[in-house]
Amino acid sequence: MTTLRKLLLVGALLGAGAGVGTALFALVTPGEERKQAMLKEMPEQYPQRRDEAARTKELLLATLQEAAATQENVAWRKNWMSGGGGGGGGGGRSA
């Protein structure tokens, strides 16, 4: 009988915890109007920021493609954002 009582108590506590969690989640979640306002404020909405992010992605992709095509360690270049040309130092570290 005590085991059944403990199981019912644990079930009730878990149910109450789930109910409180669901209620808190419903209170914290922004409404549709707030979601739209947040989307308008995102940095990707501004053309300059979008262009900058696209350029950065292009440079990163070009660097990764070059690194895949060569045996040189492009990570050791002083200016790895500029493309090609051997990097000036031979690709190695100097002591």
Swiss-Prot record:
InterPro entries with a match to the protein in the record: UQCC3 (IPR027896)
Any one Gene Ontology MF annotation carried by this entry is: phosphatidic acid binding
Where does the record place it?
Answer: Mitochondrion inner membrane
Q: How does it sit in the membrane?
A: Single-pass membrane protein
Q: Superkingdom of the source?
A: Eukaryota
One GO cellular component assignment for this chain's record is: nucleoplasm
Region feature (Mediates lipid-binding): 23-80
The record's keywords, sorted A to Z, are: ATP synthesis, Membrane, Mitochondrion, Mitochondrion inner membrane, Transmembrane, Transmembrane helix
Modified how: Probably cleaved by OMA1 under mitochondrial stress conditions.
Q: What is its main location?
A: mitochondrion
Topological domains, Mitochondrial matrix: 1-7
Any matching Pfam family: UQCC3
- Could you state one GO biological process linked to this protein? ATP biosynthetic process
State which ranges are Mitochondrial intermembrane (membrane side).
29-95
Positions of transmembrane segments: 8-28
The UniProt subunit note reads as follows: Associates with the ubiquinol-cytochrome c reductase complex (mitochondrial respiratory chain complex III(CIII) or cytochrome b-c1 complex). Interacts with UQCC1. Forms a complex, named COMC, composed of UQCC1, UQCC2; UQCC3 and UQCC4; mediates MT-CYB hemylation and association with the first nuclear-encoded complex III subunit UQCRQ.
Q: What does this protein do?
A: Required for the assembly of the ubiquinol-cytochrome c reductase complex (mitochondrial respiratory chain complex III or cytochrome b-c1 complex), mediating cytochrome b recruitment and probably stabilization within the complex. Thereby, plays an important role in ATP production by mitochondria. Cardiolipin-binding protein, it may also control the cardiolipin composition of mitochondria membranes and their morphology.
Report the sequence similarity comment from the record: Belongs to the UQCC3 family.
Report the protein name in the record: Ubiquinol-cytochrome-c reductase complex assembly factor 3
Quote the gene name from the UniProt entry.
UQCC3
